[in-house]
């Protein structure tokens, strides 16, 4: 746009597209009328002649770039192979590993790890801190819920409701090792539901981990109330940062790998 266009007493300009030039708009304002008195408009090519390098500014920027590169460029771990998380509504290798890391580190029976909190479709085999934080951008506490087998069954059934598979917004979870669930969508029931190879004991207490976001919405997400949980025992905060727990686990265990094991099988 060579000249400004005035529309409803508003000056409109455009410096073109791309990064070849920038626009310069010098405006003199009449403070008595609170209006533009005079103006000049020009486009300035972005080149060495019109935009010389500012070495002081470059050095200032590079100082902080070096610091961020040092922080985010460090190695966290190496997996045996790349681990995938292609969909939030299925068991995934990366989801299983994350659930296992929290279960083992926090000493609980079952970890329900929100699938949506894993933000990368894959991770590894070389995992830099930048990759790690991109995959796990959220950082929350983990709560331990003492629940009965009957209640855990109800919680799992809740996130496997049909809306999860028809595109509606629901919460879905990755299961830690020991869990084996076979769910029939057509019959809307469990064909199998075991923990460590045994059926869940209806009145047996299981220590189940959930992150703060899910803890704050237990009824809509998992069909259980905090009052029901507290009737079984005290709810405890096991960690204030699940991301720190996962990072430490990854750093302490090199060449980790996971496969689709059948922890969660969805049948039509």
Show which residues each predicted segment covers.
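Short, structured coil segments at secondary-structure junctions
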Residues: 7-9, 106
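Catalytic centers of hydrolytic enzymes
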Residues: 16-105, 109-268
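Short, exposed beta-strand/loop patches in secreted or surface proteins that constitute
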Residues: 2-5, 182
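Short, function-defining helix-loop hinge/capping sites that tune catalysis or transport
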Residues: 5-6, 156
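Active-site neighborhood of phospho(di)ester-bond hydrolases with catalytic His/Asp-centered motifs
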Residues: 1, 12-15
């Amino acid at each position: 746009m060579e000249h400004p266009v005035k529309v409803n007493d508003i000056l409109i300009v455009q410096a073109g597209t791309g990064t070849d030039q920038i626009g310069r708009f010098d405006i003199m304002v009449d403070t008595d009328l609170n209006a533009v008195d005079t103006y000049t408009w020009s486009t300035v090519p972005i080149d060495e002649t019109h935009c010389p390098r500012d070495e002081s500014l470059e050095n200032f920027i590079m100082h902080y770039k070096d610091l961020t590169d040092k922080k985010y460029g460090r190695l966290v771990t190496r997996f045996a192979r790349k681990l995938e998380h292609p969909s939030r509504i299925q068991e995934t290798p990366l989801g299983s590993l994350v659930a296992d890391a929290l279960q083992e580190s926090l000493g609980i029976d079952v970890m329900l790890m929100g699938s949506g909190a894993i933000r990368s479709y894959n991770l590894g085999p070389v995992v830099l801190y930048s990759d790690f934080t991109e995959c796990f951008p959220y950082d929350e506490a983990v709560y331990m819920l003492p629940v009965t087998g009957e209640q855990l069954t109800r919680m799992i059934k809740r996130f496997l409701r049909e809306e999860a598979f028809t595109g509606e917004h629901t919460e879905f979870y990755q299961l830690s090792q020991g869990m084996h669930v076979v769910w029939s969508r057509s019959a809307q029931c469990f064909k199998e539901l075991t923990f460590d190879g045994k059926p869940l004991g209806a009145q047996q207490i299981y220590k189940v981990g959930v992150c703060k976001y899910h803890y704050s919405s237990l009824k809509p997400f998992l069909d259980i109330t905090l009052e029901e949980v507290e009737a079984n025992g005290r709810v405890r905060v096991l960690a204030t940062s699940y991301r720190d727990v996962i990072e430490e686990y990854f750093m302490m265990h090199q060449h980790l790998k996971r496969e689709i094991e059948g922890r969660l099988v969805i049948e039509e």
